[in-house]
């Protein structure tokens, strides 16, 4: 088996806390980079290094020797993104450009970016595919779209993969209850009943283990 040296941004967040134990279990060496606004729920491991840092200064970090960069850093969800648009653009776009440039200069082989299915906006089509036009509405999904474009401009220098997951749900050591499925599950467990507003709308979801 080929074991890789992997650098992960946003590593202590909702998705990273599920992904990193899987990478370690497969024998890879992982450096977890996170600002740790919500602490660190990663368990200690011989192949894990945890670095507290601001992704907006990622150009100061040495990426030489890494095979893959997985970019999960983000100001998560639409309301948070709109709360401080300047911070959202800095984290999702400026930092993304600095990270891509750093990775390229450091001869990183592959780049995986966690974008969002929300870049499509609100569609009337029953099924949303990659062929449909991107019509982002909020600061969150606008910055995701721009960040994709930044990474794709480096596709001639390294392998670039942009994934657009549906709303990620499921259990994580760094739990999020702003996600509808998680919130309804919590309500059901705590109150024995759930509250559904509307009831006619549809929303795509993906389990966190299927994404990681």
Model-derived features: where do they sit?
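N-terminal Rossmann NAD(P)H-binding glycine-rich loop of SDR-like oxidoreductase domains
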Residues: 6-26
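Active-site segment of SDR-like NAD(P)-dependent oxidoreductases
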Residues: 12, 75-79, 117-126, 134, ...
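Rossmann-fold cofactor-recognition segment
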Residues: 46-57
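NAD(P)H-binding glycine-rich loop region in Rossmannoid oxidoreductase-like domains
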Residues: 55-91
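Conserved Rossmann-fold NAD(P)-dependent oxidoreductase catalytic core, especially the SDR/UDP-sugar
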Residues: 97-139
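Active-site helix of classical SDR
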Residues: 143
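NAD(P)-dependent short-chain dehydrogenase/reductase
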Residues: 149-203, 208-210
């Amino acid at each position: 088996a080929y074991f890789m040296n992997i650098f992960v941004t946003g590593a202590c967040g909702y998705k990273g806390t599920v992904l990193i134990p899987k990478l370690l279990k497969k024998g890879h060496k992982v450096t977890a980079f996170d600002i740790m606004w919500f602490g660190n729920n990663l368990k200690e491991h011989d192949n894990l290094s945890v670095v507290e840092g601001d992704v907006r200064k990622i150009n100061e970090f040495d990426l030489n020797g890494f095979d893959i960069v997985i970019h999960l850093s983000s100001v998560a969800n639409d309301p948070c993104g709109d709360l401080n648009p300047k911070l959202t653009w800095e984290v999702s776009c400026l930092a993304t450009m600095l990270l891509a440039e750093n990775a390229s200069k450091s001869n990183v082989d592959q780049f995986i970016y966690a974008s969002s299915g929300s870049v499509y906006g609100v569609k009337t089509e029953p099924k949303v595919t990659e062929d449909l036009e991107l019509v982002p509405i909020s600061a969150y999904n606008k910055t995701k779209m721009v960040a994709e474009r930044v990474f794709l401009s480096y596709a001639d220098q390294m392998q670039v993969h942009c994934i657009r997951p549906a709303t990620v749900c499921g259990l994580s050591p760094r739990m999020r209850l702003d996600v509808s499925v998680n919130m309804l599950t919590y309500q059901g467990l705590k109150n024995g009943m759930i509250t559904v507003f509307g009831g006619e709308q549809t929303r795509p979801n993906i389990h966190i283990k299927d994404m990681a």
